[in-house]
Amino acid sequence: MKEIIEKLAKFENLSGVEMTDVIERIVTGRVTEAQIASLLLALKMKGETPEERTAIAQVMRGHAQHIPTEIHDAMDNCGTGGDKSFSFNISTTAAFVLAGGGIHMAKHGNRSISSKSGSADVLEALGINLDLKPAELGKVFDKTGIVFLFAKNMHPAMKYIMPARLELGIPTIMNLTGPLIHPMALETQLLGISRPELLESTAQVLKNMGRKRAIVVAGPEGLDEAGLNGTTKIALLENGEISLSSFTPEDLGMEDYAMEDIRGGNAQENAEILLSVLKNEASPFLETTVLNAGLGFYANGKIDSIKEGVALARQVIARGKALEKLRLLQEYQK
């Protein structure tokens, strides 16, 4: 382990084999917490390569729980977090809209690391049981078309890494890894990151992980979602090819809103915001959700443009389909 950390300290990249060996040692409890923290910091300072990120994701996913389900076209819209925006739970709210629009949503998430409320926190506040067994979660998904997979429970091996992450208190490669290690074999994905310079490389990792179609999104002001406060950049993975583009609210016929307009609060406050959006109450929260759900519909390939996706998202919310999915999840995942 010492040799690996020294190599990273010299800003030398690890091979896929080296990274695989290191992570296998970590997730089997053979590395100290201090060494793990040193590794995470060294990788962050050097900058993580697609090969390193793919290796860690493949190892972590190999140690994940298996969710038995009859659904084979699941999608996730988990972001990396760590953007310090303190926004409401955008992707979690959008997940219900996507599910209401007919997409099988297996939302994968965790408690907050660097914000006030993570997806697990807000859903727990809404009465969702985070601790169902894998077989029970599979049944929920088959019955409702939506399920929440609590990352802490899905990845027992993460217990070896979490203390170092919490002690560091800053985004690391594990933030970048979380959305890549979904327990299910996803076909499509919308993945938010707060570092636009990683758009293309993250799309490459998704390709390496077997995604058929995906969008990696980086919003304005470091937001790890699409934003209405400036230019949003995306990388689209389609037919094995990666293309980069960007858009503004004006491009989609939407109004601008400042970051302050979408600030959230604690889990209970964010739960109230989520409910207000699904009830179609006009606000910057609603508009931001519509934008991100629209991008999700486009990432899934359900529609042919982001603008069409936004229109579909509005329709789903207005017809009560998104709220219906929340009520179903509250009924079955309890």
Curated annotation (Swiss-Prot):
5-phospho-alpha-D-ribose 1-diphosphate binds at residues 79, 82-83, 87, 89-92, 107-115, 119. Keywords: Amino-acid biosynthesis, Aromatic amino acid biosynthesis, Glycosyltransferase, Magnesium, Metal-binding, Transferase, Tryptophan biosynthesis. Mg(2+) 1 binds at residues 91, 225. Disulfide bonds: none annotated. Pfam families: Glycos_trans_3N, Glycos_transf_3. Mg(2+) 2 binds at residues 224-225. Pathway: Amino-acid biosynthesis; L-tryptophan biosynthesis; L-tryptophan from chorismate: step 2/5. Anthranilate 1 binds at residues 79, 110. It comes from the Bacteria. One of its GO terms (molecular function) is anthranilate phosphoribosyltransferase activity. Anthranilate 2 binds at residue 165. GO terms for biological process: L-tryptophan biosynthetic process. Its cofactor is Mg(2+). SUPFAM superfamilies: Nucleoside phosphorylase/phosphoribosyltransferase catalytic domain, Nucleoside phosphorylase/phosphoribosyltransferase N-terminal domain. Binds 2 magnesium ions per monomer. Signal peptide: none annotated. Gene3D superfamilies: Nucleoside phosphorylase/phosphoribosyltransferase catalytic domain, Transferase, Pyrimidine Nucleoside Phosphorylase, Chain C. Catalyzes the transfer of the phosphoribosyl group of 5-phosphorylribose-1-pyrophosphate (PRPP) to anthranilate to yield N-(5'-phosphoribosyl)-anthranilate (PRA). Homodimer. HAMAP family: TrpD. Belongs to the anthranilate phosphoribosyltransferase family. This is Anthranilate phosphoribosyltransferase. It comes from Streptococcus pneumoniae (strain ATCC 700669 / Spain 23F-1). The gene is trpD.
